[in-house]
């Protein structure tokens, strides 16, 4: 299933959870992702752990560290995606830092991603002006190349991003790093309208979305999807000594978020 098919199926706003591959270890990570799907996730965003995640706050940094300390490598991350594909066809997006792509080479990274079953790739620190290799590889292997749209993105730059993006726009709701926040800014709601008016791609909102009421506000403002990461990762961190409780709390949170979003599953 690609993103266009997913958005066409969803009634209301898509709910997309984000977790780090291999957090806290490979086997638990697979069960967490299975729980996300069972709870109704419309798509998945999977982060490849990185030692210097400059766009991420404390929760994701700690998740990256747990995954790396468990021995996760880029090869392991692709194997994790292959295991995910054994039990779900929902779109799987990668959120990575470009150094991981650069070290392997864009063509090889995207080839591996396509073979594993990846739908789209967002390199958090890759501006579209420098994305030639990634864009060529994405086109070659049939992967959507996704870029961040920030509150500071002006209309001219937004037009340029729209021309090279596919899949969806990843709209950053706030300036700064990832992490759960207490409210949705009014400027975010206005930004959704501006981005949707700039092109035909769906808009997914991430960074700081942590409560069902946030999801409902964003859905009402016209967001096509919401991406929730730190709030889920915090449940992983809180329950490292009790996997069953961890999975149950994650399931319950996703059900609440999914209900707030509205949807078909």
From Swiss-Prot:
EC number: 4.2.1.20
Signal sequence bounds: none
Record InterPro entries: Aldolase_TIM, RibuloseP-bd_barrel, Trp_synthase_alpha_AS, Trp_synthase_suA
Pathway(s) served: Amino-acid biosynthesis; L-tryptophan biosynthesis; L-tryptophan from chorismate: step 5/5
SUPFAM superfamilies given in the database record: Ribulose-phoshate binding barrel
PROSITE patterns: TRP_SYNTHASE_ALPHA
Residues at the active site: 45, 56
Enzyme class: lyase
Transmembrane segments: none
Catalysis performed (reactions): (1S,2R)-1-C-(indol-3-yl)glycerol 3-phosphate + L-serine = D-glyceraldehyde 3-phosphate + L-tryptophan + H2O
Alphabetized GO MF terms: tryptophan synthase activity
Annotated GO CC locations: cytosol
Keyword annotations from UniProtKB, A to Z: Amino-acid biosynthesis, Aromatic amino acid biosynthesis, Lyase, Tryptophan biosynthesis
Role summary: The alpha subunit is responsible for the aldol cleavage of indoleglycerol phosphate to indole and glyceraldehyde 3-phosphate.
Oligomeric form and interacting partners: Tetramer of two alpha and two beta chains.
Family: Belongs to the TrpA family.
Protein name: Tryptophan synthase alpha chain
Gene that produces this protein: trpA
């Amino acid at each position: 299933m690609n993103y266009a098919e997913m958005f066409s199926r969803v009634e209301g706003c898509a709910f997309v959870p984000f977790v780090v591959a291999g957090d806290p270890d490979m086997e638990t990570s697979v069960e967490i992702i299975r729980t996300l799907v069972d709870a109704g996730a419309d798509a998945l965003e999977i982060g490849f752990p990185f030692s210097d995640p400059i766009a991420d706050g404390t929760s994701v940094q700690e998740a990256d560290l747990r995954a790396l300390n468990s021995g996760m490598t880029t090869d392991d991350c692709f194997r994790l995606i292959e295991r995910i594909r054994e039990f779900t066809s929902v779109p799987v997006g990668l959120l990575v830092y470009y150094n991981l792509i650069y070290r392997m080479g864009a063509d090889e990274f995207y080839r591996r991603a396509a073979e594993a079953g990846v739908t789209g790739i967002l390199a958090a620190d890759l501006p579209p002006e420098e994305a030639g290799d990634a864009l060529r590889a994405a086109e070659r292997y049939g992967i959507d190349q996704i870029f961040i749209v920030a509150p500071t993105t002006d209309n001219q730059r937004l037009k340029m991003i729209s021309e090279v993006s596919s899949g969806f726009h990843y709209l950053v709701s706030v300036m700064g790093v990832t992490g759960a926040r207490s409210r949705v800014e009014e400027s975010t709601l206005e930004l959704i309208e501006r981005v949707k008016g700039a092109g035909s791609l769906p808009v997914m909102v991430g960074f700081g979305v942590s409560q069902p009421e946030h999801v409902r506000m964003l859905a009402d403002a016209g967001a096509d999807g919401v991406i929730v990461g730190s709030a889920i990762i915090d449940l992983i961190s809180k329950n490292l000594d009790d996997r069953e409780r961890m999975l149950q709390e994650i399931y319950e949170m996703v059900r609440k978020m999914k209900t707030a979003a509205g949807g078909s599953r």
